[in-house]
Amino acid sequence: LTLLSTSAVADMLGITQQTVSRISREGVLPYEICGSRRVYNLNDIDEYMRRENLSRAPHDHPRMVDDLPEITAISFFSGALGLDIGLEEAGVPILLHAENDTKCRMTIDTNSPEAALLGDVNSLGVEQVRTYARIPSGREVDVMVGGPPCQSFSTAGARRAFDDARGNVFLRFLELAEEIQPRYLVIENVRGLLSTAYPLKPGGNPVHGGALRLILNRLKSMGYGVSFNLYNSANFGSPQMRERIIVVGKRDGTIAPWLTPTNSSDPIWSLPQWRTFREAASSIDGEQHFTQFPDKRLRYFKMLSEGQYWKDLPKNAQALAMGKAYRLSGGKTGFYRRIWWDKPCPTLVTSPTMPATDLCHPTENRPLSIEEYRAVQEFPKNWIVRGGLTDVYRQLGNAVPIALGKAVGQTILNDMIGIDTSIPYRDFPYSRYKRTSNITWKMP
């Protein structure tokens, strides 16, 4: 029999002692009183973690092996490791993951225990990063990747850019890159980064596109040549329409090529067609787990068929179904949306039941399951994502599609040996938007 204190349980679960006390009072965690203090049976804590799909909250730790691969790469804001898996599939091994979110850290440590693990980017320095990754001072860091929190730049949010704490970690990431000096610096972010307003001078007025200009100016001052574009992941073999900016900086000042597409919806490019939700879902076997639509919304989903949305409801039901959103401007195409079987899935979001970005199964009266999320993002079947249902949706919904990460890795590896496989695709429509690349993007 092993008894644990409240502080020991908090450390195991990665939560505060106050939270341990609260869930104990709520009857979630069994305990005994010893003197004036609560004590916990280790077996009860292990059972709680099993029930809640948790692992012991990992502490920061160095890489577990000493050998150094030919290519050295480190990852920040690693999340559930979508970008990292893609890079590794391309042949870019990730030696270190840095992530601050407790559930994501559990996911990382469960699936990639031998890699180094660090936390908050604000507290990291170049020596600690190199020491934990076991990259000696005489050896270059070949690739540094990161997808800094995108909420500060998202078109769906207030877009406070660098005035938001999450935006400030973006700036710290750039400072850390300047200290580490990787040969290749990869930044992944949302489309909103192209247009987020920010002052170009202290005390100045916000300028449309100012956030991206600030980043580009910073990279230029570091001596990096920069290429970027907005990429639809469906063009790289992902069964999902997800558009993300990929910025690639090169320390030698030259410009990296754009990614090389592998799929297209247009036969003119002689590439395989976009992959579909049906293809992704066909790989699923066994029980599926999903949240539920509220009954008051479910009744309207039952009126809709595959590929339909709120405008396909009976006229007399549309205003009732939409409520206040009925009078909003814009297409509102995500409301009451049933996805198509034979098209790529729309962008996965952190919850499939958010009204403006509904993700309803084509024929069943339910949201997409976490197994369908996993299949659409192309995570390996044996990949364990820690936490409850909400946590798993969030981690998978925030992840970079693995196919897109693989395209990034292949582009970098080819560029290292002087090969540009994107030349035949100079005019390829990488996304549905115009003026989104380092050649065509301009501030108004």
Annotated model-derived regions:
Residues 7, 12-18, 22-26, 38, ...:
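S-adenosyl-L-methionine-dependent DNA methyltransferase catalytic core
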Residues 25-33:
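Short, solvent-exposed alpha-helical "recognition" segments
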Residues 53-184, 190-208:
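Core alpha/beta nucleotide-donor-binding catalytic domains of modification enzymes
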Residues 84-85, 151-155, 193-196, 237-241, ...:
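Short catalytic/ligand-binding loop motif for oxyanion handling, primarily in non-cytosolic enzymes
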Residues 131-134, 241-248:
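Short, surface-exposed amphipathic charged segments that create phosphate/polyanion-binding patches used
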Residues 202-226:
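Conserved Class I S-adenosyl-L-methionine
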Residues 224-235:
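Conserved S-adenosyl-L-methionine
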